[in-house]
Each structure stands twice: as structure tokens, then as C-alpha cells.
Amino acid sequence: MRTFIKLILKILMFFISWIVLAILIPIPEGISDVWWRFTAELVPFLAIVILTYVFNRFEKDRLSIIHFEEPIKQTLTGMLLGLIWFYIPFLLLNSLGYFEITDRSQIHMLGIWVISAFINSIMQELLVRGYLYQLVKRKYNIWPASIVSTLLFTLMHGGAFEAGPIAVINVITMSILMTIILECSNSLVIPIIMHFIWNSLGGIIFGTVSLADDYPHLYNIEITGNPIISGGSFKMEGSIFVFIINIIMIGIAYYPVSY
């Protein structure tokens, strides 16, 4: 019981410290939208990096957080899995007429927007499956760690609750998938790359994934038809197709972990 209380206090201290740092570090005023978003993503990212380093320094045995064993292989694997993960439901919805590309927009400084999405992906994975995940896993095992990470990930995507049960289930299964990929690879690199591809392609290129409201998207897409299939207002992340793909990929990824 004492170990459990100590663990809960450490989790709360870490999470609250991250929120406080992210709020207290000011974002400059009077800058363009692209640089405002870049700074808004950079601040919580720096906060999580600093806290991860500081808290891990106080552990008797350092926790392995990212683990760059085969960075090139892991990056290429993450890119391949991320493309499969995104394009299968996207192409299905597009070919069946639920998504239709209507026109194309011009995005000023597209590269900075993409870098901002990358920073956001690293920040989320470090927060959800970094220090806290490894801490709970060491104290107990993978199952409590997975529950904690999934709860955090779901809370960070609270807009899903407004979109309906499928959107919530998709967020949960996405988190479970990323956790299994983490355990398969013993590294955060692949989940980070997959998360980034999902957000950059879905949020910035096609606009079928919900990011912060100020993120632009290159293509304008009209979403029509049954919201259970199309995703409705929550876009692709509210689609039953994404749930199916998540479950299939979870099953494939879980097999080597369980045996």
C-alpha cells in the first residue's frame, strides 16, 4: 500500500509539474500564426523533456525511456507502419465516397507546421509512454502501466467524448496499439514516428484528423454519409474503419509480445 501511495504521489507530482511549466513559460505575443503554434508545441515539449530528465535522475536505477538501439531501422519501420495505419482507412473512405477532395489550399511555411506536429507527437509519447509508463511498469507490470498510459492519452483527447463512443474507442485502441508497438520494439521511436505520420498526413495534409484549430490543411475534404463510417464531425478518428484497422494491427503486433 505504501508503494502504491508513493507511486501515485510521484505520478501526480510529475503530471502537475508538467502542466505548471507548460502554463508558466510564456508564448511571445505579436508573432505570426505559424510561429505561435511552433512555440505552443515547443513549450510543453521542453517541459516534458526537462521533467523526464530531472525525475529520472532521482531514480535509483535509471529508466530506459527512448532507447535508440537501431534508430534507422526503427525510423523506417515507424514510417512504414504509420503509412499503412493512416492510408488503409483513408483510402477505403475515399474510394467508397465518404471522403471527397474538393480543392487545395496554399500553406505558408508548410515545413514549420509539420515540424510543430512532430514536436507535438514526441511530447505526447514522452508524456504518456515515457517516464510515467516505465515507472509504473517497473513498480508493477505492463498491465497497470498500459491502463495509466491509456487513461492519460484518452484525457488528452477529450474532444472524442463529444464525438461519440466510436471516437472514444478509437482513441483507446490507438493508445493500446502504440503501447504494444513500444513493447515490441523496446523503444519510443516507432510510436513517435507512427503518431507523427498520423497527425501530419491526417491533420496538415488532408484535414481528416483533428489537431489544434489553428493548424491548416493542404487539401479541403468534404465528409459525407453515415457518421459511423465517415467519422462525422470527429472526421476519420470517429470512423468504424479506423477501429477495425486498430484492432487488426493490435492483433498482429500483440502476437510476438505474447509468445
Where are these regions (language model features)?
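Interfacial transmembrane-helix boundary/kink motif in multi-pass membrane proteins
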Residues: 1-15, 35-46, 59-91, 105-110, ...
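N-terminal, membrane-interfacial amphipathic/helix-forming hydrophobic leader that caps
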Residues: 1-62, 203-259
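Aromatic-anchored segments of alpha-helical transmembrane domains
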Residues: 15-23, 86-91, 150-158, 197-205, ...
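Hydrophobic alpha-helical transmembrane segments
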Residues: 17-32, 52-63, 89-96, 114-117, ...
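Alpha-helical transmembrane segments and their immediate interhelical/interface regions
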Residues: 36-41, 144-179
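Membrane-embedded alpha-helical segments of multi-pass membrane proteins
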Residues: 39-50, 110-115, 123, 127, ...
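Function-critical hydrophobic alpha-helical transmembrane segments in multi-pass membrane proteins
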Residues: 103-163
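Functionally important transmembrane alpha-helices
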Residues: 167-227
